[in-house]
C-alpha cells in the first residue's frame, strides 16, 4: 500500500466517522431531501454583482443556495452548483450550534445555505450562513484543491470527478449539448422529421465496418449492434417520409484512437428529390448557422489554426486532391482515371509511396488509401472531397459522366473526416450487384465489407425517389467547437480497458 493510498484511506475513515455522527442526530439517516434550493450562483452574481456593500446591506436580500463545497478558507466556503460558484460565510453572528457543525464540513460535501446576501471586502458576493444543512457527506476527498486532475486516464475513468474539478470539461460537454440542440433545431427548421430506427439489426448494413455481435435469446438468432441507420432511414423515404433525420449511437467493433471510439454519435439524414450537391449546400448553411448561433462568429480556433465555417467551402475530387498535395510527384501529376482503374498501376504507386497494402484492395480502395496517406491530413479548412470510386461506395449513385466514380463526397475539417454524403443508389438491380460484390469481398478477407440485405432490395423494388443522404459525426464536430484533439475529451464515458 502506497503512502498516498494510506493517507486517502485515513481521510475516508475520518469522513465516515463524521457521517456516523450526523446520522445519530439526523432523522434522514444523514441524507436529508427536504432543502428548498431557490437560487443559483450565476443568477445571483448576474443580478447583484453590480451593487455596493452598503446597497446590499440596505436591500436585505435573502437567498437560498445549494451545491458542493470546493474550498474552505476559515469562515468562508466556496460553493459550486451547475451554474457557477458563490461563497458562504460562517461569521460571528452564526448560531453556536451551526458554528460547531461547520467544523465537520469537508471539501466535497454538498450543503444547502440560506441567509442574507453580502459583499466582502474583496468585492465577492457571499451568503451569510444563517441556516445551513448538510445534504450529502462526501466520503472520498477531491483531488488536491480544485485545480483539476492531471492524469488523463483517471479523468476518463472517473468522469464524475473530472466534471467536479475541471471547468474546461464541464464547458466542453455543455457545448456538446448546445451543438446537438442547434443541429436538431436547424433540421426541424428545414422540415425534416426526427425518427428513431432499430439499434439492433438482424443484418448489419449502411457502412463498411466490423459489427458487434450479440444473441437474442427469445428469437434464438444472432443480432448486430447497428453500424449505421442508413438502410432503415431509406426504407422510410420509400414509405413516403421525404425528409427524415436521426441523432443516435452507432457501434463499430474497431480500434481506439484520438478519432475513434467504438460507440459514437451520428446525425444521419435523408431528403427526397435532392442530390449530393444539395447536401453540400445544406451542410455549409448548417455549420455557418450553428457557429454564428453558438460562438457569435464563423471563425473558431483549433490548435494552431483558425477554422472558418463562413464558406464557401473548397470542393475537390479525390483525384485532384491527391494531385494538389503531391505537387512534386510526376506519376501522380499525370495520373488519369484510366490509370486509376489499373490495379497493378495503383499497387505500384502505393508501394512507391512507402505504403503497406492488402492483397484484396481494389482500385478504389487503393485510391482512397493514397488520398488518406498524402492529402487528408492537410485538409484543415472545411473541404468537400468528391469523386469517390463506386467499388468503395456500394450505396451511392454512379456519376452520369464517369461510371467509375459516384455522386458522393466526404467532408473534412482539421485533417479528419467529419461527414459523408451522396446521391443515393435507387436502382434495385445495380444495388443487388453491388451487394453481391461486397459478399465476394468479405469472402476474400475484407471483414468490413457489407452483408447482402434482401429486404432492402425489396424496398428499393417498391421505388425509392431520387434521394440524397448524409451522416455527420457529432463527436468530431464537437471536437472542433471545443478545440479538443482527442475524441475521449468529448464523450462523457469513453471506452476503456477494464482495470485489474
UniProtKB/Swiss-Prot annotation:
Entry binding sites for Mg(2+) 2: 417
Compartments, record wording: Cytoplasm
Keywords, comma-separated and alphabetical: Aminoacyl-tRNA synthetase, ATP-binding, Cytoplasm, Ligase, Magnesium, Metal-binding, Nucleotide-binding, Protein biosynthesis
Top-level lineage group: Bacteria
One cellular-component annotation, GO: cytosol
Annotated TM spans: none
A Pfam family that the UniProt record links to this protein: tRNA_anti-codon
EC numbers: 6.1.1.6
Gene Ontology annotations of biological process type: lysyl-tRNA aminoacylation
Entry binding sites for Mg(2+) 1: 410, 417
Cofactor binding note of this UniProt entry: Binds 3 Mg(2+) ions per subunit.
One example GO MF annotation: ATP binding
Gene3D superfamilies tied to this protein: Bira Bifunctional Protein, Domain 2 (3.30.930.10), Nucleic acid-binding proteins (2.40.50.140)
Cofactor: Mg(2+)
PROSITE patterns hit by this protein: AA_TRNA_LIGASE_II
Reactions listed under catalytic activity: tRNA(Lys) + L-lysine + ATP = L-lysyl-tRNA(Lys) + AMP + diphosphate
Keyword Magnesium: yes
Principal place of residence: cytoplasm
Subunit structure: Homodimer.
Family statement: Belongs to the class-II aminoacyl-tRNA synthetase family.
PANTHER family xref list: LYSINE--TRNA LIGASE, CHLOROPLASTIC_MITOCHONDRIAL (PTHR42918:SF15), LYSYL-TRNA SYNTHETASE (PTHR42918)
Protein name, per record: Lysine--tRNA ligase
Gene: lysS
